[in-house]
Design a protein with these regions (language model features):
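Basic, amphipathic "hinge/linker" alpha-helix immediately C-terminal to the N-terminal HTH DNA-binding motif
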Residues: 85-106
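Short, hydrophobic secondary-structure boundary micro-motifs
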Residues: 50, 82, 121-122
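Membrane-interacting alpha-helical segments
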Residues: 1-8, 56-67, 119
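Amphipathic alpha-helical dimerization/coiled-coil segments
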Residues: 2-8, 19, 39, 103-122
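Canonical helix-turn-helix DNA-binding module
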Residues: 52-81, 88
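N-terminal helix-turn-helix DNA-binding core of bacterial DNA-binding proteins
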Residues: 20-64
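Short loop/turn motifs at secondary-structure junctions and domain boundaries
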Residues: 16, 84-85
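N-terminal leader segment of winged-helix/HTH proteins
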Residues: 1-29
Length: 122
């Protein structure tokens, strides 16, 4: 069970509260692409990643969908969008501090996926 922190007190979440929390989570990071984008950015934190690079590296995502997903992730404060001041401005994307809190979740999903693939191909 999860825990709820409120007014300095911690209590165990009810089943209904846990299900609501899962719905909230899936609303923000669910779908086909958001977790992939977050994991991609997490694995490349030392690089400057622009839209074109992300589009090239994450196979199968359309330009229109990538733009929408990046906007959604930025709106939910999971990624940062930074524009340089060069003559030809470039925009770079990275995980925000808050977005880094999703890294353990993506790691768990990756491991589960690897384990599952091994299990079904035995």
């Amino acid at each position: 069970m999860g825990n709820i922190k409120k007014n300095g007190n911690i209590r165990e979440a009810s089943c209904d509260e846990e299900l609501r929390a899962m719905r909230d989570c899936l609303f923000i990071i669910g779908g086909k692409w958001k977790l992939l984008i977050l994991r991609y950015l997490a694995n490349r934190q030392h690089l400057e990643l622009n839209y074109t690079k992300i589009l090239q590296d994450i196979g199968g995502i359309s330009p229109k969908v990538l733009i929408k997903e990046l906007k959604d992730l930025e709106q939910n404060q999971l990624i940062c969008r930074k524009q340089n001041n060069d003559k030809v401005p470039k925009v770079f994307y990275s995980l925000s501090g808050y977005g880094k809190t999703v890294i353990p979740l993506t790691e768990a999903i990756v491991q589960w996926g690897l384990d599952h693939r091994s299990k079904i191909t035995e």
